[in-house]
Swiss-Prot record:
It is found in: Nucleus. GO terms for cellular component: nucleus; ribonucleoprotein complex. The gene is LARP6A. It comes from the Eukaryota. This is La-related protein 6A. The lineage of its organism: Eukaryota, Viridiplantae, Streptophyta, Embryophyta, Tracheophyta.
Amino acid sequence: MSSLPLRSGEKMESPSISDAVPLHAPEDATADFSQPQSPLHEVDSFPVTESSDDVVVNVSEIPNLSPSDDDFDHERNSGEDRDQDHGENPVETDGVVVPIDELNQKIIRQVEYYFSDENLPTDKFLLNAMKRNKKGFVPISTIATFHKMKKLTRDHALIVSALKESSFLVVSADEKKVKRLSPLPEIRDPKIFTVLVENLPEDHSNENIREIFGKAGSIKSVSICDPNAVEESEKGGKKENFIRTRLHAFVEYETVEAAEKAAATLNNEQDWRNGLRVKLLEQAAGKFAQRRPARREVDKEKDTTGRVHDQTGGEKNKKTREHQNHRLHHSDNPADDDGGNHQKDKNGNKGRVVGQGRRQNHQGGNGIGHGTASSSSHPNYHPVEVSKRPPGPRMPDGTRGFTMGRGKAIPPPTSTQTSHEV
């Protein structure tokens, strides 16, 4: 180790914390601060030159100039200090720098609201996540994916450290899950505390409804619903799902007994014009839910019955046509097919001669035994032979397509033509 330069007349003494050395360095001495310097074990002070005057500075007041891993992390993080032990360092949240103490309180309030009695009974996603764990824990990684939590922070360790300070929540031993400290109380079903009111009076303001229904018990809330007004005011928006299409109101009581009393005492069906219609919401909603599937089933049965009827009718018509064709070609008595035309055949072949002739010709092809007695014994009876349709092309009117050449045989030469040739 090189010794420091001494002033004239000074003696070399052992260094101590209280000792100071002049801050002048030789002009030819060069200090390389680009490389890490070894810690000063033997000298606790070193010279620094600010001006021509000699200034003595205590080493304990000067920070260590040797770079460390924390310094490099500081540069990589653009000056953000991630030391979380003191809670004084600001953290950037959604583009805004927030002190870490304030951020911790925001995280605690937000997660406590997720697990609160106000939100949890209506949060189906969080309830299902709690049911997956026997102890009711929810992964903190799941909580961190919520929209409002993303705005606060995405640092998992920061969320864990904040939730540990909560008096309402408990963090698991592995610091990966969180749950309520006290179990969730029995969920209150608002339907059993609420009555549905229809046929409202002309003055159906909130105050008047409270005055009328307050006689049955303590009222928690009153909501008046006008589907027509909502439809006009929310054009193009999402419509609310009302269980009634007319003006109605919901009155929620503090107790079930008060709701039942209101339904029993304030319901007036005798006065069909001005009387109130009061029912428990649970009963009204149940009837409404049962009515809708019943209508769907009726419509489904109608469609099914119509299709079955069409199929049955089509099959019947098809069988009838097949039966008629079968009788037409294989019946022993052709007069049966013509109903009352049998007497006309006796008196002189009246009726549809062509159709009868076809059947007679078809039936009499083997000689005897298939025609009727009256027709076969008639003196003027001549069976009509139906010529087969000649092959060849046909014109649209049914005539043959060619008069000469193809499609028609050349007539034989007459006697005059033969004699002339000779």
